[in-house]
C-alpha cells in the first residue's frame, strides 16, 4: 500500500515538473499562482513520498464541496467529494503543520457566452489534495495544493481550443474552517491544460470561492 502510494506520488511529481517547465506557454495564465500551485504540489508529493512510512492509517472522513470559478471568458461550478484523509504522524509534521492528503473527485460544468467553440462542457477530475493546516484558537487555517488528471467532454469551449479531452489540473487554495473542521470557506485557483501534449493548448485559469462541508 505504501509502495503504491510512493509510486503514485512520484508520478504526480514528474507531471508537476513538466507543468513547471511550461509556465510561459500561455499569455492568459496567472504566473505566480500557477507556479505556486505546481511547485507547492511538487514539493508536497516529494515530501510525502520520502515520508511514506510516517503516515498514520487513512481514516474515513467524508466531505462535499461546491466551488465557483471564473476567468476573463469562462465560468464554472464544481462539486467535489472525498471519503478519507491520510495524515502524517505528529512527530513528522513539517514545522508543526498538520499534513493531510485527501484523494478528491471533482465534477465541473464550464460555460462561455462567446467564441466559436461549444457554449458548455463537463469536466471530471481526480486529484490527491495536500493540505497544510495550522490550528489557531477556535479556527483552522490552511493552504491546499494538488495536481490531478481531468477528462473534458469536449476539446474546445468558447475561444479556448484545448486539442485534447485529457487534461491536467493544478490548484492552490487558502481557507479557514472551524475547530471541528465541519465547515470550511476558502479561495481556490485552478489551472487546466494538457502540458503541451498537443497544440493549440489554451489554458484555463479559474479563480473563485470554495465551500466545504463535513458529512
Name the predicted role of every residue range.
Residues 1-55:
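Cleavable N-terminal export/targeting peptides
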Residues 37-45, 61-70, 92:
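N-terminal periplasmic/intermembrane-space "pro-region" immediately following the signal or transit peptide
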Residues 55-70, 97-105:
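Transmembrane beta-strand segments of Gram-negative outer membrane beta-barrel proteins
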Residues 64-66, 79, 99-101, 130, ...:
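Hydrophobic beta-strand residues in large extracellular and virion-surface proteins
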Residues 74-78, 125, 206-208:
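Short hydrophobic/aromatic beta-strand or adjacent loop that forms the aromatic wall/cage
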Residues 84-92, 107-203, 212-215:
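Outer-membrane beta-barrel transmembrane domain signature
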Amino acid at each position: 500500500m505504501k509502495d503504491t502510494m510512493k509510486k503514485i506520488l512520484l508520478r504526480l511529481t514528474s507531471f508537476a515538473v513538466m507543468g513547471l517547465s511550461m509556465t510561459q506557454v500561455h499569455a492568459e495564465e496567472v504566473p505566480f499562482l500557477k507556479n505556486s500551485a505546481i511547485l507547492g504540489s511538487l514539493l508536497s508529493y516529494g515530501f510525502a513520498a520520502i515520508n511514506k512510512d510516517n503516515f498514520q492509517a487513512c481514516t474515513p472522513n467524508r466531505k462535499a464541496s461546491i466551488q465557483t470559478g471564473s476567468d476573463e471568458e469562462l465560468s464554472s461550478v464544481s462539486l467535489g467529494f472525498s471519503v478519507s484523509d491520510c495524515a502524517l504522524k505528529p512527530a513528522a509534521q513539517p514545522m508543526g503543520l498538520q499534513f493531510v492528503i485527501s484523494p478528491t473527485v471533482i465534477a465541473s460544468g464550464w460555460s462561455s457566452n462567446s467564441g466559436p467553440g461549444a457554449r458548455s462542457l463537463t469536466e471530471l477530475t481526480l486529484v490527491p489534495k495536500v493540505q497544510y493546516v495550522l490550528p489557531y484558537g477556535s479556527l483552522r487555517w490552511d493552504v491546499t495544493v494538488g495536481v490531478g488528471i481531468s477528462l473534458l467532454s469536449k476539446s474546445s469551449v468558447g475561444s479556448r481550443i484545448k486539442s485534447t479531452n485529457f487534461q491536467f489540473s493544478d490548484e492552490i487554495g487558502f481557507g479557514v474552517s472551524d475547530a471541528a473542521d465541519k465547515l470550511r470557506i476558502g479561495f481556490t485557483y485552478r489551472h487546466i491544460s494538457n502540458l503541451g501534449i498537443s497544440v493549440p493548448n489554451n489554458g484555463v485559469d479559474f479563480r473563485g470561492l470554495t465551500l466545504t462541508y463535513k458529512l
